[in-house]
Curated annotation (Swiss-Prot):
Keywords recorded for this protein, A-Z: DNA-binding, Ethylene signaling pathway, Nucleus, Repressor, Transcription, Transcription regulation
Protein name: AP2/ERF and B3 domain-containing transcription repressor TEM1
Gene Ontology biological-process annotations: cellular response to hypoxia; ethylene-activated signaling pathway; photoperiodism, flowering
Major site of localization recorded for this protein: nucleus
Subunit composition and interactions: Interacts with FT.
Localisation per UniProt entry: Nucleus
Induction: Expressed with a circadian rhythm showing a peak at dawn.
UniProt-annotated stretches for the region Disordered: 1-73
Gene this protein is translated from: TEM1
Any GO CC annotation of this UniProt entry: nucleus
Length: 361
């Protein structure tokens, strides 16, 4: 077929003229230049919360959905229009929570940076606690994790306000109330004792929980109830968070819940830390109090056991041997009556016979 095209002189010029006109090339170029049926756009994520779009038609980079950057340190915009706060500790990001207002997120960063870096840290706003150290004392009384937890749950302002009322007066100066709390009987009478509990070995052991006596729990710390086939029972949810202040002004956060398995009310999260810091041991007494004022603030403190724990050997329900003084527990025997006394006499007789046999051998 190629030979016939070359031998025909009449068609040579046509073939040459046709070859000079770039019809195939034009068709190919049209095919290459025409956009595909489905337009394809490549996305490249940029920094600062913006995404860069590579437009395949004109080859230009265009910005879309660019989030406005914040003018405050430690504040980052969120796609939903809210603002997040963050701080870096040892090259790791610590998330402080999400807030509706940009200034609120900036204030949360300022609180965190004063706890993490100290009072001289660079903040977004001028510190409002110059001239008194109420907030500094509050920050020092709580760990970094506790401050971050308050900021995330938006409870920092409430807890600081409770502490500030006991720390400063109307002029913003120390009121000395923290010392009066322990030295003034009138202040002590402003609290009512709810109940006391002597902690058991399991309360201060590896179970990491404190069992609240049922009668006191239902009276002073009632939980929302739910209707079941057995009647009204406390809601078996994850429980609620309660704040209790100790005598140093430190606020302790405990998770208070109801366990269906053991049908008991317990303090779980936060309790093990309280045991460790206060060095609680079995036999110590934990006291729960409530203020008589309108705030109804809850308090917790503890007392060392009045006498050392004595290990007693029991046989058939009778205290027969006291390990601490290595003598028979005469007091326990005297309280049980004549029957237990006769049993104790028989036991003593048996011990003396065994001792006599050993001496003979």
């Amino acid at each position: 077929m190629e030979y016939s095209c070359v031998d025909d002189s009449s068609t040579t010029s046509e073939s040459l003229s046709i070859s000079t006109t770039p019809k195939p090339t034009t068709t190919t170029e049209k095919k290459l230049s025409s956009p595909p049926a489905t337009s394809m756009r490549l996305y490249r994520m940029g920094s600062g919360g913006s995404s860069v779009v590579l437009d395949s038609e004109n080859g230009v980079e265009t910005e879309s959905r660019k989030l406005p950057s914040s003018k405050y340190k430690g504040v980052v915009p969120q796609p939903n229009g809210r603002w997040g706060a963050q701080i870096y500790e040892k090259h790791q990001r610590v998330w402080l929570g999400t807030f509706n207002e940009e200034e609120e997120a900036a204030s949360s960063y300022d609180i965190a940076v004063r706890r993490f870096r100290g009072r001289d840290a660079v903040t977004n706003f001028k510190s409002q606690v110059d001239g008194n150290d109420a907030e500094s004392a509050f920050l020092d009384a709580h760990s970094k994790a506790e401050i971050v937890d308050m900021l995330r749950k938006h409870t920092y302002a409430d807890e600081f306000e409770q502490s500030r009322r006991k720390f400063v007066n109307g002029d913003g100066k120390r009121s000395g109330l923290e010392t009066a709390t322990y030295g003034n009987d009138a202040v002590l009478r402003a609290r009512e004792v709810l109940f006391e509990k002597t902690v058991t070995p399991s309360d201060v052991g590896k179970l990491n929980r404190l069992v609240i006596p049922k009668q006191h729990a239902e009276k002073h710390f009632p939980l929302p109830a739910m209707t079941t086939a057995m009647g009204m029972n406390p809601s078996p949810t994850k429980g609620v968070l309660i704040n209790l202040e100790d005598r140093t002004g430190k606020v302790w956060r405990f998770r208070y819940s109801y366990w269906n398995s053991s049908q008991s009310y317990v303090l779980t999260k936060g309790w093990s830390r309280f045991v460790k810091e206060k060095n609680l041991r079995a036999g110590d007494v934990v006291c729960f109090e409530r203020s008589t004022g309108p705030d109804r603030q809850l308090y917790i403190h503890w007392k060392v056991r009045s006498s050392p724990v004595q290990t007693v050997v029991r046989l058939f329900g009778v205290n027969i041997f006291n390990v601490s003084n290595e003598k028979p527990n005469d007091v326990a025997v005297e309280c049980v009556g004549k029957k237990r006394s006769r049993e104790d006499d028989l036991f003593s007789l048996g011990c003396s016979k065994k001792q006599a046999i050993i001496n003979i051998l």
